[in-house]
Amino acid sequence: MQIFIKTLTGKTITAETEPAETVADLKQKIADKEGVPVDQQRLIFAGKQLEDSKTMADYNIQKESTLHMVLRLRGGY
C-alpha cells in the first residue's frame, strides 16, 4: 500500500509499505530513498510518535495515510 510522509520543509515522500511492516522498516526505506539517517527520523501519525517496534496495523495506518516526519537533531557539544 502507498503512504505519504510529509517533511517539515513541506516535501511529500511516497513509500510502499504493508500493514505488518514495522515502523523501523519504514524508516529504513526513507533512509534509503532520502538519505536521512534512521536515528534522526521521528514519525508522527494522528498526533502520536511512532515506536520502531510497532507495525503499521498497530497504528491503523492505511493506504494513502499521511505521516509527518520531524528530524531529531543531535547537539553539537
From Swiss-Prot:
What function does the entry list?
Answer: Viral ubiquitin that may play a role in the viral ubiquitination of nucleocapsid proteins to direct the egress of the nucleocapsid out of the nucleus, therefore mediating the formation of budded virus (BV).
- Say which family it is in: Belongs to the ubiquitin family.
What is a biological process (GO) this protein takes part in?
A: symbiont-mediated perturbation of host ubiquitin-like protein modification
By what name is this protein known? viral Ubiquitin
Keyword field: Host cytoplasm, Host nucleus, Host-virus interaction, Isopeptide bond, Late protein, Modulation of host ubiquitin pathway by viral ubl, Modulation of host ubiquitin pathway by virus, Ubl conjugation, Ubl conjugation pathway
User: Which SMART domains does its entry note?
Assistant: UBQ (SM00213)
List the record's Gene Ontology CC terms alphabetically. host cell cytoplasm; host cell nucleus
Cellular compartment(s): Host nucleus; Host cytoplasm
- What are the coiled-coil residue ranges? none
Give the organism the record lists: Autographa californica nuclear polyhedrosis virus (AcMNPV)
Which gene holds the coding sequence for this protein?
Answer: vUbi
Tell me if ATP-binding is a UniProt keyword of this record: no
**Could you tell me at which residue positions the Glycyl lysine isopeptide (Gly-Lys) (interchain with K-? in acceptor proteins) crosslink is annotated in this chain?**
G76
Q: What is its main location?
A: host cell
Q: Which residues form the propeptide?
A: 77
Pfam families according to UniProt: ubiquitin
- Which positions hold the covalent cross-link Glycyl lysine isopeptide (Lys-Gly) (interchain with G-Cter in ubiquitin)? K48
